[in-house]
Amino acid sequence: VPEVHYLPEDDRTGLDSIYTHDPLKVTKKGAVYFPMGKPLRGREWMASKAYLESIGIPTLGRIEAPGKMEGGDVVWLDERTVAIGRGDRTNDEGIRQFRELTKDFVERFIVVPMPHGEGEDACLHLMSVISMVDRDLAVVYSKFMPVFFRELLLERGIRLLEVDDEEYERLGSNVLALAPRVCLALGGNPRIKASLEGEGCKVYT
């Protein structure tokens, strides 16, 4: 990774701020900020916005109430195709606003209904069940994935590396791509690590 930025200390952030996908997404036109559902993270977007603007990243917009959206529900499949998880943390109004903000450069929006799972507090996002590692490679937990979405991924030529139940419970499906086929994964999940390495990925844990 050629450049890493650290968010400065700010009283609007907390321990959960390490999950930097959640309060915003950066697009080619600027950042979109999301109001976090967890009260303790409600002002996190403000700290992120202030810092990103200070380093020259413009603001495209923000999802406003009653819209709800979190970055963990937004997965880019390519530059013009985005999948959005519709669940406890992202609602229809939030999706509508995101469509409006990105309509000039996104051609296809795929809304993916999310299961209730273990309940709202479990915070199940779309990125809990799919992590893109390259344009044609993803780590997935198919058990929580709608059939139409899984079929769509396969039709796009994306190879799916399946996480089993045991490693899913250890966050094995949460993989961060640093570059195509270069990723950061949680240690203690040897099977999905081996699957990634079998596809030529460099895996850091």
Locate the predicted segments by residue.
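The feature marks the mature, well-folded catalytic cores of soluble enzymes
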Residues: V1-T205
